């Protein structure tokens, strides 16, 4: 366990344009929720924050496609994403919005502080303007023929076919990816740049001090810091209508009228603003004790969760904003980053509708099925792959055959022989003593993995704890003992029933609904076990045989789902 009693947890904030797929979920929100639930169960004070990332060109275009004003579209999609998060039992203390007044004010505040520190430069640059669209086009919204390979759908930042990096002016016959118009003009425009290069030494020292970070996190950070020309200054404003208006604190910024801050500047600041939103909502009383080191946050451990594509911004750009401000904001202590989850021999694709999206997943199965499979296959050290065959096999084996079967067998056996009450029986014997010793070791190992956020190892240990109980029940065989020694059968039954609240407490971070069902069936509360003594349920304690925890996935279901989610959303 961390030596601090308070942990701040943030998940990379999902973009507003549409519903996210399972690959997005397992790379940020879901493991963050696992860790938050675990720490709360162990008695820590936790603040778990997430939000929707609402600014930028894709939001404007998605709103136009939906026929809605962008503010209305973002409000609607925030509500949709919040409802889906509840469906997956994501236990955010607050699910905020980057378009909030709090984030506007805080983003403008940081920009002012950075400018005061000499870390903002005004840069004249050339950008492509589309007359038909009435807007400057981001590089990736310009298409044309690649001068290198001739691919006719190359984007203005890179050719997907030959991977050559491009500028929009390199393209042959360029056109707007929004309207298809070729009526384009290169115009001069002025933008603000964050002078990250001035903070390179400070950032390098800070990253080097994080010796406990995952290799994936530090390797990406150091690559961006050191490769090629090293850390580059970064544009933090855009010529758009929708976003945080450019201001220097509370004051107007001459020459920046009509511009907004770049989404990647304001989005991480929303982590802080989200806590301020939570105060307004009433879910917490004081946000600064979590975020300001001079106001109590010096005893906070801050952990971030994200996919590997977000690592450069969280290890360099956002820390540059924090450090450059010269103010005592809380910097991240640990960044848990993830590789990609691929889908059935290819990639998940939001644009092509390929793979399972979060709303669809909840339509076909309860959230615990998805939570268990995704977390037990979390892409921590390498990319992972979702296949329907593996999903069916693992869910049926782990959840139905091992955990669900154990709970069903022992509760139904007890009901048939002793009623729905924990029997008295004799004393425990060598089998029980051996299992308690084994479970004590496994409990310690499980907690070690959870403390270290080694998710796959933690899942494997939890599975082994379930298996140990199943093997005990099979070996002790109370149904056989009952024929010749009812007292011994009663002792076995009492012991095995006590495994259920033990399992419920340990399983709750992974499968909260099933854990709650186990606890309710045993007429007890969900609590984290201090040890494996298994004394929660005394003789005479009443219980109710719970409903089937996990139904098996049939071959017909698997085949139907594999066909349904092969491409193009319904």
UniProtKB/Swiss-Prot annotation:
Q: Is Cytoplasm among this UniProt entry's keywords? A: yes
Q: Which Pfam families match?
A: Anticodon_3 (PF19303), tRNA-synt_1g (PF09334)
Tell me yes or no: is Transport among this UniProt entry's keywords.
no
Q: What compartments host this protein?
A: Cytoplasm
Q: Name one GO cellular component term.
A: aminoacyl-tRNA synthetase multienzyme complex
Where on this chain does Zn(2+) bind? 146, 149, 159, 162
- Amino acids binding ATP: 350
Q: Where is this motif: 'HIGH' region?
A: 14-24
**Can you provide one Gene Ontology molecular function annotated for this UniProt record?**
metal ion binding
Needed cofactors, names only, are: Zn(2+)
Give the function comment from the record: Is required not only for elongation of protein synthesis but also for the initiation of all mRNA translation through initiator tRNA(fMet) aminoacylation.
Per the record, the similarity remark reads: Belongs to the class-I aminoacyl-tRNA synthetase family. MetG type 1 subfamily.
Q: Which PANTHER family match?
A: METHIONINE--TRNA LIGASE, METHIONINE--TRNA LIGASE, CYTOPLASMIC
Name of the protein in its database record: Methionine--tRNA ligase
Q: Gene encoding it?
A: metG
């Amino acid at each position: 366990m961390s030596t601090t009693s308070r942990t701040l947890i943030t998940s990379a904030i999902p973009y507003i344009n549409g519903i996210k797929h399972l690959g997005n979920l397992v790379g940020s929100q879901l493991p963050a929720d696992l860790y938050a639930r675990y720490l709360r169960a162990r008695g820590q004070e936790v603040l778990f924050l997430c939000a929707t990332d609402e600014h930028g060109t894709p939001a404007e275009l998605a709103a136009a496609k939906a026929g809605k004003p962008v503010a209305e579209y973002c409000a609607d999609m925030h509500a949709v994403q919040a409802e889906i998060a509840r469906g997956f039992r994501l236990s955010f203390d607050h699910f905020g919005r980057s378009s909030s007044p709090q984030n506007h004010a805080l983003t403008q505040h940081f920009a002012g502080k950075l400018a005061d520190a000499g870390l903002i430069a005004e840069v004249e640059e050339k950008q492509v303007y589309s007359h038909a669209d009435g807007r400057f086009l981001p590089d990736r919204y310009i298409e044309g023929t690649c001068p290198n390979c001739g691919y006719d759908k190359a984007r203005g930042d890179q050719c997907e076919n030959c991977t050559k990096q491009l500028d929009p002016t390199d393209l042959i016959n360029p056109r707007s990816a929004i309207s298809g118009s070729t009526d384009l003009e290169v115009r001069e425009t002025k933008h603000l740049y964050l002078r990250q290069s001035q903070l390179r030494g400070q950032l390098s020292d800070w990253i080097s001090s994080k010796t406990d970070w995952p290799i994936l996190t530090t390797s990406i950070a150091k690559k961006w810091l050191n490769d090629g020309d090293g850390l580059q200054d970064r544009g933090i404003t855009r010529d758009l209508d929708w976003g945080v208006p450019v201001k220097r604190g509370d004051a107007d910024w001459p020459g920046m009228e009509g511009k907004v801050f770049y989404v990647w500047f304001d989005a991480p600041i929303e982590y802080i603003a989200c806590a301020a939103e939570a105060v307004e909502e009433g879910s917490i009383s004081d946000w600064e004790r979590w975020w300001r080191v001079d106001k109590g946050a010096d005893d906070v451990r801050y952990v971030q969760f994200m996919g590997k594509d977000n690592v450069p911004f969280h290890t360099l750009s956002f820390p540059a904003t924090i450090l450059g401000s010269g103010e005592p904001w809380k910097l991240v202590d640990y960044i848990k980053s993830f590789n990609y989850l691929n889908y059935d021999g290819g990639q998940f694709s939001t644009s092509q509708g390929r793979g399972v999206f979060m709303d669809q997943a909840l339509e076909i199965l309860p959230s615990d099925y998805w939570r268990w499979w995704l977390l037990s296959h979390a892409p921590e050290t390498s990319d992972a792959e979702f296949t329907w065959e593996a999903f069916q096999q693992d869910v049926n084996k782990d959840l139905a055959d091992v955990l669900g079967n154990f709970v069903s067998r022992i509760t139904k056996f007890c009901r048939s022989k002793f009623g729905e009450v924990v029997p008295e029986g004799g004393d425990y014997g060598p089998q029980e003593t051996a299992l308690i010793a084994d479970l004590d070791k496994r409990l310690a190992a499980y907690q070690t993995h959870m403390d270290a956020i080694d998710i796959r190892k933690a899942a494997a240990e939890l599975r082994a704890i379930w298996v140990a109980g199943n093997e005990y029940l099979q070996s002790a065989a109370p149904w056989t003992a009952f024929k010749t020694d009812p007292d011994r059968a009663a002792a076995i039954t009492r012991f095995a029933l006590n495994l259920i609240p033990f399992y419920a407490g340990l399983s709750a971070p992974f499968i909260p609904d099933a854990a709650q069902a186990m606890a309710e069936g045993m007429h007890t509360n969900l609590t984290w076990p201090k040890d494996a003594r298994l004394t929660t349920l005394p003789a005479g304690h009443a219980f109710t045989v719970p409903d089937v925890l996990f139904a098996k996935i049939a071959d017909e279901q698997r085949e139907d789902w594999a066909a349904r989610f092969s491409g193009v959303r319904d």
